[in-house]
Structures are given as C-alpha cells and as structure tokens.
C-alpha cells in the first residue's frame, strides 16, 4: 500500500481551500481505474488530507471567525465530493464494460447436457385418464386413504361376514374397535360424493389403495385404482359400455375393443368383468382382463339417500399398475415400486 503524502497545512481562506480542492480534483482526474481513484480519495478526503485537517482546525480560530471559515471548508469539501462521485460513476461504467467483454459467453460452445427427471409413469397414466374423463364432462373426486369401515364396506353393500373384511385381506388400523381401515378400493370416494353432491353426478376417482398382498411380479400391497361413477335419470348398461369403449380407444388406440363377462360385486347389480382387446399386446393381439363394472346396486343408492326408482347409475374401476403393465409390456410389477430412477426417466417407460 502506498503511503499518504505529507501535505502542508491549508490556510483557512477561500484561496487556500480552493487550491487544496483543485489539487484533489486534478488527482481524481488522472485516476485511470477505481483502485487509483480510491487511493486519490484517501489522499484528499481521508482523515490526514488537507481539507479534513482544515475542518478539525476550526476550533483553534477565534469564535467570531469560525462560522465563515466553516462555511468555506464545507463548500470546498462539497465540491470535492461531488467531483469524486462524477469520476467514480465514469470509472465504474468503464469497469463494467471491460468486465462484460472479458466474461462474454460464446453461445456456439456445446453445453453439458443435464439429465432431467420425469413423472412416475403411474402418475402420468392417472392424469391422462383423468383428462379423458374431464373432457367428457366428469369431475375428479378424492377421499381419505384411512377410511371408516362404513364407507369402505357397509355403505357399499358388503355383508358383515364378507371375506374381504378379514385381516387376511384388509389392513385394520387404529385402536381396537375403531372401525378404521386402509381403504381397499377407491369406491368409498363414490359414496362420499353421492352424499355430498346433488344428482346428476359424474365423477372419476383416481387414488392409492391397500391390500394385504405380498409383493411379487403381479401383486403389490399398495397400488393405484381409478374408478368412475355416473348417477342420473335413465342410465343403462349401454351408457356404461359406451363410456368404457371411449376410454379404451382413447387410451390404447382406435382398434381397441371391449367386452363384458357376467360377474358379481356387492356394490353393482348387474355386474361384469370388462376385457379389452389390445392390438399391441406382448406376444400378439388378444383379450386382457382389465377391470370390473356394473350398474350401481339400488341398496348403495339408498344408502346415499338417492331414490333408485328415479335415478340409476353405473360404476367401473381398474388397476393402474395392471393397465400400465400390459400396455407397456412390463413383466414385473416390482419395477413400478422400487424407486429406480432409470424406470422413470424419459427414455424409459412412457405413460
């Protein structure tokens, strides 16, 4: 660091102060960069500089001279600081311009490609199905995963000793006698919707469900379903069939077909299994079991306070893991739940 020059004392006169200010302004003017300007500022505005020293010497003057001398010192200092600010602004602009030139980015240089993440295929498939139904005028409904037995079983026409209610099939949670379970299907959302909304009702209910299955190539204790419910006047199995046909063709392609096989579910009557003809099935085109469906059981409508003599409804549901598995030719359901990022990256499975 350079030493500060040893300046002679400044006369507390207008001429003496003007000479000191002129010397400082000349020093500011010859500075070629901010570092040199800061050195000049220290030399001419620092504590040992002439004008600050002149200010401190005001106390040695007779009282009647201090006011005028103080005014002259302040004028000189103000002139100096104003000029310093002007020079600093110019040098800062010059420094910024030089810095920008030195840091110029060559846009022709190839960049490093960063790997991006992707939504899990189950999430993407769920959102796609929801979008299909929203386009048909349906609403998306959701409900709690920890559910009362009443909504999971009783209100859906499950008899008290139905095997699905046992510990072998259902996770019972909470204190003994609390009647709380991890929902085994998304059908409770349908009942909650019927209780909370006025008819007509058209909703689709995607969500996570839980069953006491062992994790293997075709089963998982935590999986995803999507269910649909329509309640209105005059609905029939024909409306249900048309809805499922539209869903299948939109999801799998225009050559896709559906068929129904009679079955039994407590909450629908009549009930059916729905199969889909999938032209891109691994091993060749063929029929694949897809889900369950049927007309809403009158007892379920009554539990929701809906008159089955006036209104009818249909419902359907399918597993998203199974849908993704046959649509994308996956052989092991464990790939969907083990969290391997290679499974979800864009170049992997696309949903």
Curated annotation (Swiss-Prot):
EC numbers on record: 6.1.1.20
SUPFAM superfamilies: Class II aaRS and biotin synthetases (SSF55681), tRNA-binding arm (SSF46589)
Chief localization: cytoplasm
Transmembrane residue ranges: none
Required cofactor(s): Mg(2+)
Record note on quaternary structure: Tetramer of two alpha and two beta subunits.
Subcellular location: Cytoplasm
Top-rank taxon: Bacteria
Pfam families, A to Z: Phe_tRNA-synt_N, tRNA-synt_2d
Keyword Isomerase set for record: no
Cofactor binding note of this UniProt entry: Binds 2 magnesium ions per tetramer.
Name this protein carries in UniProt: Phenylalanine--tRNA ligase alpha subunit
Any single GO BP term: phenylalanyl-tRNA aminoacylation
GO cellular component: cytoplasm
Keywords per UniProt: Aminoacyl-tRNA synthetase, ATP-binding, Cytoplasm, Ligase, Magnesium, Metal-binding, Nucleotide-binding, Protein biosynthesis
């Amino acid at each position: 660091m350079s030493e500060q020059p040893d300046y002679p004392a400044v006369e507390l006169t207008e001429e003496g102060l003007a000479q000191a200010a002129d010397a400082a302004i000349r020093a500011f003017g010859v500075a070629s960069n901010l570092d040199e300007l800061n050195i000049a500022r220290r030399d001419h505005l620092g504590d040992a500089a002439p004008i600050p020293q002149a200010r401190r010497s005001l106390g040695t003057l007779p009282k009647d001279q201090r006011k005028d001398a103080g005014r002259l010192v302040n004028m000189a200092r103000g002139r100096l600081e104003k000029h310093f600010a002007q020079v600093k602004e110019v040098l800062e602009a010059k420094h910024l311009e030089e810095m920008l030139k030195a840091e110029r980015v060559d846009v022709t240089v190839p960049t490093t490609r960063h790997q991006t993440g992707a939504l899990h295929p189950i999430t993407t498939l769920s959102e796609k199905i929801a979008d299909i139904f929203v386009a048909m005028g349906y609403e998306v409904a959701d409900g709690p995963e920890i559910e009362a037995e009443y909504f999971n079983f009783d209100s859906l026409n499950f008899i008290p000793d139905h095997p699905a209610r046992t510990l072998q099939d259902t996770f019972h949670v909470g204190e003994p006698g609390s009647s709380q379970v991890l929902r085994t299907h998304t059908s409770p959302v349908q009942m909650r919707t019927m209780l909370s909304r006025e008819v007509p009702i058209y909703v689709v209910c995607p969500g996570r469900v839980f069953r006491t299955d062992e994790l293997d190539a075709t089963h998982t204790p935590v999986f995803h379903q999507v269910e649909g419910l329509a309640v209105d006047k005059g609905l029939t199995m024909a409306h249900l069939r048309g809805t499922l046909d539209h869903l299948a063709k939109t999801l799998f392609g225009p050559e896709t077909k559906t068929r129904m096989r009679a079955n039994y579910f407590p909450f629908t009557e009549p009930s059916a299994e729905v199969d889909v003809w999938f032209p891109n099935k691994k091993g060749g085109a063929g029929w694949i079991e897809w889900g369950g469906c049927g007309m809403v059981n009158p007892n379920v409508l009554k539990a929701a306070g809906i008159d089955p003599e006036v209104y009818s409804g249909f419902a359907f549901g399918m597993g998203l893991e199974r849908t993704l598995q046959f649509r994308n030719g996956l052989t092991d359901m464990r790939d969907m739940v083990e969290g391997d990022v290679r499974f979800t990256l864009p170049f992997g499975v696309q949903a």
